[in-house]
Regions:
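Histidine/acidic-residue-rich, glycine-tolerant segments that coordinate divalent metal ions
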Residues: 1-94, 104
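Metal-dependent amide/peptide-bond hydrolase catalytic core
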Residues: 57-173
Length: 173
């Protein structure tokens, strides 16, 4: 995609629990972080619910659809989500709602495929509820890396020079 065109080096460290540096192919997964936002139509939930189109229903159906689809994904696949916006009060059909997903896989191509499945599930949820998938916003990503040995060795040298802090028991909680 050209995101690193003309870039000579990227200094990156994902600090593990052992606070050490390493090199070579990373053993972890990469991810894309996506916020799906739906728009519907507000209505009084008791007085005229037929006038409403619940964006929250779209979010919930996306989550249900994703959980059924997840059963048929690779064992290495991981995903997580939280509902960020589910409406303001129970007696109003929510006109807006959003859900935040992490799609995790072992390589860039598989992450993109997983993300495309998420998009399809979101579009299906909007169709089922008569709402609109208003936006799909990438909040961040972390592609699987291949870490550079000379940079890792320099980082280790700097850690040795600066020294790590002495952790107290309370710091570990």
């Amino acid at each position: 995609d050209g995101v690193f065109k003309d870039v000579d080096v990227v200094l990156f460290s994902h600090v593990g629990s052992n606070l050490q540096t390493g090199w070579g192919a990373s053993q972890g997964s990469g991810l894309v972080s996506v916020l799906y936002s739906f728009e519907g139509q507000a209505a009084h939930a008791a007085g005229a619910p037929w006038r409403g189109r619940s964006a929250l229903d779209a979010v919930e159906l996306m989550d249900v659809g994703w959980n059924f689809r997840r059963e048929h994904l690779r064992l290495q696949t991981r995903s997580h989500y939280v509902i960020r916006n589910g409406g303001d009060q129970p007696n109003v059909v929510p006109p807006t709602a959003s859900v935040w997903y992490y799609f995790r896989e072992l390589d860039y191509k598989k992450i993109r495929e997983l993300w495309a499945i998420g998009d399809s599930v979101a579009e299906g949820a909007a169709m089922m509820t008569g709402t609109k998938l208003a936006s799909e916003r990438v909040l961040g990503s972390a592609w699987p890396g291949h870490f550079n040995k000379p940079i890792a060795e320099d980082m280790t040298e700097n850690i040795t020079l600066v020294r790590l802090p002495k952790w107290k028991t309370d710091d570990q909680r």
